[in-house]
A protein has these predicted regions:
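C-terminal, extended alpha-helical scaffolding domains
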Residues: 152-156, 176-198, 202, 217-246, ...
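Structural signature for solvent-exposed beta-strand/loop edge elements and short helix-capping sites
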Residues: 1-167, 177-189, 341-345, 356-373, ...
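Short, solvent-exposed loop/turn segments that connect beta-strands within catalytic domains
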Residues: 31-35, 209, 314
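Short, aromatic- and cysteine-enriched interfacial helices/patches
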Residues: 129, 163-166, 207, 270, ...
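Acidic, Ser/Thr- and Pro/Gly-rich intrinsically disordered regions
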Residues: 115-117, 140-142, 150-152, 187, ...
Length: 442
């Protein structure tokens, strides 16, 4: 369709906190569902004060075009990335590219060559033989001598099936080269090669006042990864079963602010409801290895989450505090570093606090509290973020000291007005092994 003048906003209220104003507009919907706008004049207006000129062509996607990040391990600190327009390489495949420039490497490096200052993130998504497939590459240098050690690759093929008695399950075939993993007190560890597959099922259900979800996963693969307590590598088969149940029980639920743009939706696209819940996780991991060894764990973690205020007043009207303690029982030992259970007693604390207006501070950490462990007192995860949260957009600066990664993000919320998006995600402590085993691609 065409229009001489157009206004577009993701804010259902007037005045809109963020809107796009364009002249001489031609709009085309792409095959992947994205909307491509071409205009003679295009600008983003924020809070009716800030006018930001925009390109004549704009593609509405969930991620912003520019990325500002910190990666102390692979990129030597601060870097800038640019998300290019996706390329349709075939009828069923789309290639997304993000060239990167290593700013801090350029500033600090005395003998750095041009090829070391650039990197690339690439993602190829598509469908083959009815399977959804995603392949990703993370290249942090183009220096020929360092290209092999400066690149990481991983991908999978995924499909849904229905099995008798089990219902719908997901099957996934995976592969990885130099995959970057984290394992609590052991820190970063590389999986140099992985090839295998698994089936899994995820479900949610309510039981009385509790909301529950479960995951089970059965997998088999061959891994070449760093050996536990050694600098050498180990190559071995690994068969494993993982099961997890999360529950949240509502103890007290308050009343949200009136559903108006001056109250409940003053700063947030969702109404904040005061309350107290008790959250628990029970999980087990059974793993057998090609050398005849095995490792079995049974973990329990739980704790309260208290929400005070409705985030509708200009000062200290939203506080969210979470606390979680975890205990793990362990039998046997893994030959690998990436799945070795070492943090057998943990404590996590997270807090989100409104400072003034839409300014929020979000911080949290998990530590090892096993008095008999050599890692007693070690931080096994941490996060801190300062965000400017509005009904239709948010801006955040975040850093994870444990992983040494961080960044700056600006995001317009989804046009269906149904969530806060990233990075406004209050930190909730969780059992480390439960988190690590569900987030990995294998």
């Amino acid at each position: 369709w065409k229009a001489e003048r157009m206004g577009l906003s993701n804010d259902p209220y007037t005045p809109a906190q963020a809107r796009i104003e364009a002249e001489g507009v031609i709009a085309r919907e792409q095959s992947n569902g994205e909307l491509l706008l071409s205009a003679r004049r295009n600008r983003l207006i924020v809070e009716e004060r800030l006018h930001v000129p925009m390109p004549g062509k704009h593609r509405f996607r969930k991620k912003t075009s520019w990325t500002f990040g910190i990666d102390n391990q692979d990129r030597d600190g601060f870097f800038i990335g640019r998300n290019l327009q996706p390329i349709e390489v075939a009828r069923d495949f789309t290639l997304s590219l993000q060239p990167q420039f290593m700013v801090q490497r350029a500033i600090n490096g005395q003998n750095t060559t041009i090829s070391e200052l650039f990197g690339l993130k690439a993602e190829l998504k598509g469908q083959i033989w009815g399977w959804d497939t995603t392949w990703e590459a993370d290249i942090t240098t183009f220096k020929p001598q360092d290209l092999a050690d400066g690149s990481r690759y991983w991908g999978n093929l995924e499909n849904d099936f229905e099995l008798p008695w089990l219902g719908d399950i997901t099957a996934r075939l995976f592969g990885a080269h130099r995959y970057r993993a984290w394992n609590g007190s052991l820190g970063e560890t590389d999986i140099y090669a992985a090839l295998g597959g698994f089936i899994e099922q995820r479900k949610t259900f309510d039981l009385g006042k509790s909301s529950n979800s479960y995951l089970w996963r059965l997998g088999l693969g061959n891994y070449q990864a760093e050996r536990f307590s050694s600098v050498s590598l180990v190559d071995s088969m690994r068969a494993n079963f993982y099961g997890s149940i999360n529950s949240s029980y509502s103890i007290w639920r308050g009343k949200e602010a009136p559903m108006t743009p001056q109250k409940a939706y003053r700063y947030s696209p969702v109404a904040i409801v005061p309350g107290l819940t008790f959250d628990t996780n029970v999980n087990t991991l059974l793993a057998a290895y090609g050398d005849g060894t095995h490792q079995n764990t049974l973990s329990f973690s739980g704790g309260p989450t208290l929400t005070l205020g409705t985030f509708s007043q200009p000062f200290l009207d939203y506080t969210r505090v979470s606390m979680s303690g975890g205990v793990t029982l362990k039998q046997g030992s893994s030959p690998f570093n990436f799945d070795q259970a070492v943090d057998l007693s943990t404590l996590g604390i997270g807090i989100t606090q409104q400072i003034v207006g839409p300014l929020l501070l979000n911080a949290g950490f998990d530590i090892n509290v096993d008095a008999g462990s050599e890692f007693y007192g070690d931080v096994i995860n941490s996060n801190i973020e300062l965000s400017w949260q509005r009904r239709s957009y948010d801006f955040g600066i975040y850093f994870n000291p444990y992983e040494g990664i961080g960044g700056i993000r600006f995001r317009l919320h989804d046009f269906d007005f149904n969530g806060t998006g990233v990075p406004f995600m209050p930190y909730t402590p969780t059992n480390w092994m439960e988190m690590a085993n569900t987030d990995r691609p294998f």
